């Protein structure tokens, strides 16, 4: 089940530095691992292995407290919505770490996206708003929030971009996905597109290269695919713990092959589907202490084919690599 926003332990307080800038951490964070998992035996299924573990529990740079959202920029830098530390962390491929935000600027950030110009989009569940920042952390604009008169979000939890730099927000408690242009102008709402397809607390959204929109219809335990015109044309998954089944799915990502990755949060795993909904991978299949996931809430893909998983209640990020295909 989705467990919400875990509180910080009594002996730990969030980062208090309210300066809105990047702060560099000396040394390197990322540590490669060699654990192999998610081996698959079914026909045409692919397998992925754990290649790297990033971060641990805490409030220092390079540590996480309930990482909920992740994104990768064109330079393969990783961005993590470090929710209970009220910040975004940027981690370079070399392992350098930078922090953006603090409790005076961000309140429980849930989703993060980065465009081709390295502008950063953050949705804050705690403030019911979306903020846009420049590549160096400078404020650009915000939408929503407690004083907003027109834009009203209710627990926005995920955000993604399309090839036109439109951004899509999973506006969870409004049971919709809403779309804005890069300049912050409203473009379109996707809410209960048909009587048969009515969203219930959607907590993930992704757009593929063809403009099709994938919505994690979380409390209906499925993913709904919409055409570029917003018409539902496929339902992926069904409720349950089995292969290809979903329990409260959250984050979504499209990989290099056009495959759909789903953070199957309630089943403590991630799964890959083809664009048409055929399940082809599950991680982990045989959990070990190194590979076990705890309510993962987000997934992202980089330009080399690696998959990143926000292991939310494990307070870390895992990087997965392909281990090949078994027929």
Label every model-predicted segment.
Residues 2-47, 325:
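Sequence/structural signature of beta-propeller modules
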Residues 33-68, 79, 95-108, 139-155, ...:
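Gly/Pro-rich loop segments of beta-rich domains
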Residues 72-75, 114-117, 161-164, 207-210, ...:
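Residue-level detector of Asp-centered blade-edge/turn motifs that repeat once per structural unit
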Residues 77-79, 119-121, 166-168, 212-214, ...:
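Conserved beta-propeller blade signature
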Residues 83, 125, 164, 172-173, ...:
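Short loop/turn segments immediately following the C-termini of beta-strands
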Residues 96-175:
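A generic tandem-repeat structural signature
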Residues 295-327:
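Blade-level signature of beta-propeller repeat domains, shared across WD40, Kelch, NHL, RCC1
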């Amino acid at each position: 089940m989705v467990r919400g926003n875990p509180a910080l332990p009594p002996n730990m307080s969030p980062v208090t530095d309210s300066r809105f800038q990047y702060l560099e951490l000396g040394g390197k964070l990322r540590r490669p691992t060699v654990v192999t998992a998610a081996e698959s035996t079914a026909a045409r299924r692919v397998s992925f292995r754990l290649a790297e573990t990033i971060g641990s529990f805490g409030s220092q740079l390079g540590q996480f407290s309930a990482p909920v959202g992740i994104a990768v920029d064109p330079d393969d830098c990783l961005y993590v919505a470090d929710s209970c530390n009220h910040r975004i962390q940027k981690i370079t491929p070399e392992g350098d770490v930078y922090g953006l935000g603090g409790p005076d600027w961000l309140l429980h950030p849930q989703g993060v996206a980065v465009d081709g110009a390295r502008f950063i989009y953050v949705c804050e569940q705690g403030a019911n708003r979306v903020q846009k920042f420049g590549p160096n952390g400078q404020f650009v604009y915000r939408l929503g929030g407690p004083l907003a008169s027109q834009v009203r979000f209710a627990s926005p939890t995920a955000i993604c971009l399309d090839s036109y730099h439109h951004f899509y927000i999973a506006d969870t408690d409004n049971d919709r996905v809403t779309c804005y242009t890069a300049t912050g102008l409203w473009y379109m709402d996707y809410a209960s597109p048909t009587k048969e397809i009515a969203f219930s607390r959607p907590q993930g959204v992704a757009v593929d290269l063809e403009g099709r929109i994938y919505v994690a219809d979380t409390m209906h335990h499925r993913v709904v695919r919409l055409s570029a015109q917003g018409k539902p044309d496929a339902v992926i998954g069904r409720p349950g713990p089995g292969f290809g089944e979903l329990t409260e799915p959250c984050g979504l990502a499209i990989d290099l092959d056009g495959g759909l990755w789903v953070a199957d949060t309630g089943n403590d795993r991630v799964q890959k589907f083809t664009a048409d909904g055929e399940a082809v991978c599950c991680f982990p299949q045989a959990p070990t202490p190194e590979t076990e996931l705890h309510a993962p809430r987000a997934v992202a893909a980089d330009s080399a084919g690696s998959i990143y998983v926000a292991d939310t209640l494990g307070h870390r990020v895992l990087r997965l690599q392909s281990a090949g295909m078994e027929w």
